[in-house]
Amino acid sequence: MLLALAQWLQGDASFLRLFTYLTFRAVMATITALVIGLVCGPWVIRKLTQMKVGQAVRKDGPQTHLVKSGTPTMGGVLILIGIAVATLLWGDLTNRFIWIVMLVTFGFGVIGWVDDYRKVVYKDPRGMSSREKYFWQSVIGLFAAVYLAFSVSEANNVRVFDLFMAWVRSGLSMGLPARADLMLPFLKSISYPLGVWGFIALTYFVIVGASNAVNLTDGLDGLVIMPVVLVGASLGVFAYVMGSAVYSKYLLFPHIPGAGELLIFCSAMGGAGLAFLWYNTHPAQVFMGDVGALALGGALGTVAVIVRQEIVLFIMGGIFVAETLSVMLQVTWFKYTKKRYGEGRRIFKMAPLHHHFELSGWKETQVVVRFWIITLMLCLFGLSTLKLR
């Protein structure tokens, strides 16, 4: 919004050219989202408390968590407000990637809001059924996947439609340009051509998978928000590089016109996330809820797909991956041993993984900070792939 205004008025006021610089707008988006979160936080927490949307704690979880029962949840709306305002103020609203990321983020946020609402109203920690949740996630994820398959490959929406029609006329067998290939970290001239169907399948898996992985990780005060901020900031760097014809050529990445604008979104997400951490740090005054976790995970997955860094997201989001795998392994092993031996056995003391460490004697704050440190190291490793190729 402010970019369009600056472009319109810069002939009358030369200082407004500052607003056309992507890095300046990214910094301002971070500050805007941070200030909005810090200022609106007490009001949002107070309203959530008045609405009596307290968190229902799992009875089979760690006993130390029982004191958290009744803490306001659905605080993810505070993050989404900060992201929305900062992105709309400082982003280029003609950029197609901004809108598709916003669509996925807020679409998944609505799913999470319904899930949280059911948990609060019916006092049931399970919320929406898994089938219902995955159905709506799949609807949004598949829509985004189909659009991005052609959007990443072309420079504007007109050419996106032309490419889509060419694919239809080919009998759904036409391939995609090289910039839509799966990029392999550390290899500068080797990529894997996915084709339209492969791109759609991978994108769906990344978006929906990232959303649920972040949601599973959100189990301790402050645990998930800092990794989201770190991974989001790192993806913002990739977006800046991929969106620049100069830097992408120098670093041997495919140039994706318009991708650089995602730096604004990632910056807004970082600022909003830090503001939320102010109130979510131990002992938490508010919980993110599914409305925040599902939305942020979907956002990370979508940005990673656009900048063609799905594998790097897997690396930098290693904590999310480990948490998800711990649940999958626990459930699979329990069912297998129950069928084979008549008694279910566990690999971990409790899943997701952060509960295993809690029951192993780690304090909650130790688990949280150590997971932050691991994520920081993984993000630095992921960023190293910019040059080590």
Curated annotation (Swiss-Prot):
Superkingdom, taxonomy of origin: Bacteria
TM ranges: 25-45, 73-93, 97-117, 135-155, 190-210, 222-242, 258-278, 286-306, 311-331, 366-386
Main localisation: membrane
GO molecular function: metal ion binding; phospho-N-acetylmuramoyl-pentapeptide-transferase activity; UDP-N-acetylmuramoyl-L-alanyl-D-glutamyl-meso-2,6-diaminopimelyl-D-alanyl-D-alanine:undecaprenyl-phosphate transferase activity
Keyword Membrane: yes
Membrane topology term: Multi-pass membrane protein
Pathway: Cell wall biogenesis; peptidoglycan biosynthesis
Gene Ontology cellular-component terms listed: plasma membrane
Family statement drawn from the similarity comment of this UniProt entry: Belongs to the glycosyltransferase 4 family. MraY subfamily.
NCBIfam families in the record: mraY
Name of the featured protein: Phospho-N-acetylmuramoyl-pentapeptide-transferase
Organism of this sequence: Burkholderia mallei (strain ATCC 23344)
